[in-house]
Amino acid sequence: MTELTINHTLDTLGLRCPEPVMLTRKTIRNMADGEVLLIIADDPATTRDIPSFCQFMDHQLLKSQTDTKPYQYWVKKGLDHL
């Protein structure tokens, strides 16, 4: 598998819902389309909230690791329409 280029990292360890999603939204708002954000979290609610956020806000959840803590999510700003 090709290694993902990470442009930004957001550490939300210790934060609980809704803070991880609020910080994700704030961070992505300041990113350029196509950039990738790595989100690191330990709140079990993020396993539901981050994928839902991506779908609702039209971002791509490229990859996630939710088997063990800390959870990791790779989110690309915007959607590829090719």
Swiss-Prot record:
Primary subcellular site in the record, as a coarse category: cytoplasm
Gene Ontology cellular component annotations, sorted alphabetically: cytoplasm
KW Cytoplasm (keyword) present: yes
GO biological process, alphabetically ordered: tRNA wobble position uridine thiolation
One MF annotation (Gene Ontology) recorded for this entry: sulfur carrier activity
Compartments it resides in: Cytoplasm
Domain of life: Bacteria
Assigned keywords, A-Z: Cytoplasm
InterPro entries referenced in this protein's UniProt entry, alphabetically: Sulphur_carrier_TusA, TusA-like, TusA-like_sf
Gene3D superfamilies for this protein: TusA-like domain
Catalytic residues (positions): C17 (cysteine persulfide intermediate)
Family named by the database record: Belongs to the sulfur carrier protein TusA family.
Cited function: Sulfur carrier protein which probably makes part of a sulfur-relay system.
NCBIfam families (alphabetical): PRK00299.1
Alphabetical list of HAMAP family matching this protein: Thiourid_synth_A (MF_00413)
Protein name, entry field: Sulfur carrier protein TusA
Protein's organism: Glaesserella parasuis serovar 5 (strain SH0165) (Haemophilus parasuis)
Lineage, highest ranks first: Bacteria, Pseudomonadati, Pseudomonadota, Gammaproteobacteria, Pasteurellales
